[in-house]
């Protein structure tokens, strides 16, 4: 059997797809492009309406380009709207998230899907050719109730992988040659709460900080209230942990944060990122913001842009508000017009570009540890800057690079 996996969305979905691919390969299936595969698995996202649309377009394109293929759809869109997905061309099966990990076995043994409790999951088998970094999912599900978010309905309750399983996967990844591992989860900050053995996110990060092999761990997105002083201190002190944080802000006005049901204030967020910057002057600190949330007035939008300009952030992901039926925000009045949302998104993206420019400028002339990627002619630094280097070396090697060039066009050269 020839298979192809098409993935949309977050790092958790990417990790899920890698696990599916690894199990399919282990069961004798062969990877192929979507237009040549017997079976195409589409792993969908549903965080926004445009994510749903992108999945539908991809499925229709697969049906057009490979009319003989069987299309299996999984992920958050498939979980949220199974009948809608099942009606798309060539879709032979819709697999909800809590049965995703049985998919490879079903395909290769023709077993019927049984009931499942959606445990956090099967062990991965790392080793995808051409990759230097692995995304390792250690947690899934979310029990927060952000008023705009559909994900708790599609991913279910929070479930953590036990620490022995996580360490076993890391050992396998190191043996397979990976030198960077991104640790991810749907609500990573809740890691361990369901294990009932005292394990916490800090327990996990402390284990990573003391890992004996020369591997870099990159902690994926953390909610601000979960990024404790202890976690920040561990990252600052350990060579094993990348100086890289992603901390979703969502808005700068406490009134909007309360409407979004985000459990922190703008002042709390500012103190957090300023503490990180004080401890790690070269750290990458990314964030997410939502513009056009119901009830957002022009004054709120202006305050957001002003607040962002005062923060030591390095890059932004800007999300125009997307109405998700079934969420509290969907029932809110005072919706912002589409034209206003687009203008506000443009203003915030401009602020984000300025943050990135300032960060790039601060890094010119510095020497950073980096991993060679692609064919060895590119590097990714520990603080998440990707740039070409003047001469190629072997892929997947640790090097030191001196950063040159200009903001938006950084260039590295090997430092002695």
Task: Pin down the residues of each PLM region.
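Residue-level signal for inorganic ion chemistry
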Residues: 41, 76, 103, 183, ...
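Contiguous mid-protein beta-loop-alpha structural module that forms a pocket-lining wall or clamp
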Residues: 296, 312-313
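Proteins enriched for Cys/Gly/acidic motifs involved in redox and nucleic-acid/cofactor modification
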Residues: 1-191, 206, 230, 245, ...
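Glycine-centered loop/turn positions within well-structured domains
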Residues: 101, 144, 189, 254-255, ...
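Active-site proximal loops enriched in glycine and acidic residues that flank catalytic Cys/His/Asp
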Residues: 7, 185, 221, 249, ...
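Short glycine-enriched, charge-decorated loop/helix-capping segments at active-site entrances
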Residues: 46, 155-156, 194-198, 258-264, ...
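Terminal RNA-binding accessory module
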Residues: 331-416
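Conserved SAM/AdoMet-binding glycine-rich loop
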Residues: 71-72, 80, 175-299
